[in-house]
Structure formats: structure tokens, C-alpha cells
């Protein structure tokens, strides 16, 4: 999204999978899903017990049981990621606020919103659809935040339909 603002000529369409301009709540008008204190607590857990953090976060992200294939993949990926790099990534994601950038996007967008997403509520997909000038909102009937991993067939089908291929 940000790249399309800086270099719009490089993009003819965007496909946004489970996007959010901000995970943080910004009362009263924007509900990103998390209060700052909650995310700071999550970062503290990460600092104190990285493996415990990954065991907690993996099923939250996947929206599946701890022993599911998708959750297991997340746990394995977290386990092999340098905690310092994971922390930098988590900080950049959790505390970013790109709401002002949304209206700057002029590239047509497909928003793939997960129906039951613990990280990005459906209201965020609706917010993006309302604020992205040329967007389509497609609700994927899936749990979790990563349908590209848990239900790639649904994501591919929606992408092909949007791209008309």
C-alpha cells in the first residue's frame, strides 16, 4: 500500500490479505482491536519468554487449535526466528499507524478480509473499503489471520476472480 503511494506507476492493482492500517484503538472513531497497554504487555511477554510468547500468539494468529498444521507452522517459524528480529517486526506491525495513508492510495484494491480474525476485526476491512477510493471487499469465510496459509485455495480463487485470470 505504501509503495503504491510512492510509486503508483509500478502497480495496476493491489491485493491486501487481512490488512490493517493500525492494530491500535484510536478512540472514538477507530477500533483497531487492541489497546496500547495490551500490545505493550504482549511485547513484555516476548521479552521475558519468547517461546511462551510464540506458543500464545501462534493459535491467536492462526485461529486454530494448538496442534493444527497452520499453528504448528507458526510455532516452528517463530522458533527459528531471531527474537531480536521478531521483536523489531512485531513493534513495526503492532504500533504502526497508517490511517492517514489509506486515503492517498489511488491504485484499485481487493481487500481479502477474514470473517473470524483475532487480529483484524471485520470492521477494519469495512473501514478500509470505505476509505480506499477504488476497492472491493471480499469476506473470506475463515478463522484466523492467515488464510493464505490455512485456506490458500480460497485466497487464490478470490485473487483470480479479481484479476480476471
Ranges and model annotations:
Residues 91, 98, 107, 121-130:
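Short alpha-helix in the alpha/beta-hydrolase fold that links the catalytic acid
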Residues 105, 111-113, 117:
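Short beta-strand/loop motif that positions the catalytic acidic residue
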